[in-house]
Amino acid sequence: MSRRHSAEKRQIIPDAKYGDVVLTKFMNSVMYEGKKSVAESIVYGAFDIIESRARVNPIEVFRAALDNVAPAIEVRSRRVGGATYQVPVEVRHERRQALAIRWLIQAARSRNDRTMVERLSAELLDAANNRGAAVKKREDTHRMAEANRAFSHYRW
């Protein structure tokens, strides 16, 4: 890690259809091997399915899913005198968003539907309704933090 400068944050351009910066970050995470057009077609296809099935604005479903998946607290390992403790710490906003995006995509990829469009739309709808693998991951993280609450005084 460099000691001179912290890397400057790049300006992310909002997506063309909905004008949302977070959605662009989501698409960039879905993207493989720089194929942004494929990632866009996957995300927009999933949004079309959400719109036709649930009859609601897909961007609202997306935001609700992100809010329901984003963790408020997580555990980090801290070594104290030969023992390693799992110390619960609060999660910064940027990391909350990044974790929520990562967990949603991982959960969608591990589903058993035929195409990624179907898997992603199903996972987003589930997460918006507080169900699904991504929400379970957040609950497991919170449960782990709650179980290790006794070590919270080791926070840094």
From Swiss-Prot:
GO molecular function: rRNA binding; structural constituent of ribosome; tRNA binding
UniProt keyword terms in alphabetical order: Ribonucleoprotein, Ribosomal protein, RNA-binding, rRNA-binding, tRNA-binding
Xref: Pfam families: Ribosomal_S7 (PF00177)
Keyword Hydrolase: no
Cellular compartments per GO CC: small ribosomal subunit
Keyword field contains Membrane: no
PROSITE patterns (alphabetical): RIBOSOMAL_S7
InterPro entries in the cross-refs: Ribosomal_uS7, Ribosomal_uS7_bac/org-type, Ribosomal_uS7_CS, Ribosomal_uS7_dom, Ribosomal_uS7_dom_sf
Biological processes, Gene Ontology terms: translation
Assembly notes: Part of the 30S ribosomal subunit. Contacts proteins S9 and S11.
Family from the record: Belongs to the universal ribosomal protein uS7 family.
Biological function: One of the primary rRNA binding proteins, it binds directly to 16S rRNA where it nucleates assembly of the head domain of the 30S subunit. Is located at the subunit interface close to the decoding center, probably blocks exit of the E-site tRNA.
PANTHER family to which the protein is assigned, alphabetical: RIBOSOMAL PROTEIN S7 (PTHR11205)
Protein name from the UniProt record: Small ribosomal subunit protein uS7
This protein's encoding gene: rpsG
